[in-house]
């Protein structure tokens, strides 16, 4: 990861200044920002032409970065989640009062993934917190896997692109309910 140190540091600086970045994930390029910065999230919603009602997925480098945003769940259910992490699996949890409404949208849950992607994980570690992870696309368009297309579509609309290899998955991550195990998106 030494080859990416400066790029990650630049991305973290951008995030701390309220910027919106693109970065590689397990499947596609993601667009993200500081989930606690309302202005940054509003900018991301504008860029994606996305309704605030939909909510966002958060990625983290470890559970403790996102645990305060969730209500406690049954230990067996939590163990099932932990069996898939770190990895390309997103789970919804009951949202705590700490979870901003602009992240949960119209839902009483919050969607979380502890990422296994080396750059995304390092980005969360260096940022010292979770990030929004939304597929790099505009509403209704397919997610972007190629940095050249990313630049064409988003150009100067985003503040920083952290280039790097994508993970081996070719579709956005599945989403499951952490309490029931129900598949919400394949």
Swiss-Prot record:
A single cellular component GO annotation: cytoplasm
Keyword tags: ATP-binding, Cytoplasm, Nucleotide-binding, Nucleotidyltransferase, Transferase, tRNA processing
One Pfam family it belongs to: Sua5_yciO_yrdC
Stored SUPFAM superfamilies: YrdC/RibB (SSF55821)
Top-level taxon: Bacteria
GO annotation (BP), single: regulation of translational fidelity
Any one GO molecular function term: ATP binding
Subcellular location, record wording: Cytoplasm
Chemical reaction(s) catalysed: L-threonine + hydrogencarbonate + ATP = L-threonylcarbamoyladenylate + diphosphate + H2O
Domain annotation YrdC-like: ranges: 5-186
Electron transport in keyword set: no
InterPro entries recorded: DHBP_synth_RibB-like_a/b_dom, Sua5-like_dom, TC-AMP_synthase, TC-AMP_synthase_SUA5
EC assignment: 2.7.7.87
Thylakoid keyword on record: no
Job description of the protein: Required for the formation of a threonylcarbamoyl group on adenosine at position 37 (t(6)A37) in tRNAs that read codons beginning with adenine. Catalyzes the conversion of L-threonine, HCO(3)(-)/CO(2) and ATP to give threonylcarbamoyl-AMP (TC-AMP) as the acyladenylate intermediate, with the release of diphosphate.
Family label: Belongs to the SUA5 family. TsaC subfamily.
HAMAP family tied to this protein: TsaC
Protein name per its UniProtKB record: Threonylcarbamoyl-AMP synthase
Organism: Coxiella burnetii (strain RSA 493 / Nine Mile phase I)
């Amino acid at each position: 990861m030494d080859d990416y140190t400066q790029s990650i540091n630049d991305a973290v600086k951008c995030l701390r200044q309220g910027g919106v970045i693109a970065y590689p994930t397990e499947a596609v390029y993601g667009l993200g920002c500081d989930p606690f910065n309302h202005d940054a999230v509003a900018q991301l919603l504008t860029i994606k032409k996305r309704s605030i009602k939909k909510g966002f997925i958060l990625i983290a480098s470890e559970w403790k970065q996102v645990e305060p945003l969730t209500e406690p769940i049954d230990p067996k259910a939590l163990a099932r989640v932990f069996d898939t992490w770190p990895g390309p699996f997103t789970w919804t949890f009951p949202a705590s009062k700490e979870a901003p409404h602009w992240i949960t949208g119209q839902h009483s849950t919050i969607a979380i993934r502890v990422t296994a992607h080396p750059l995304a994980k390092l980005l969360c570690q260096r940022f010292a917190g979770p990030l929004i992870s939304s597929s790099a696309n505009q509403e209704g368009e397919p997610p972007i896997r190629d940095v050249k297309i990313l630049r064409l579509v988003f150009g100067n609309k985003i503040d920083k692109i952290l280039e790097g290899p994508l993970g081996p998955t070719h579709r956005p991550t599945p989403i499951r309910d952490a309490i029931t195990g129900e598949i919400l998106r394949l």
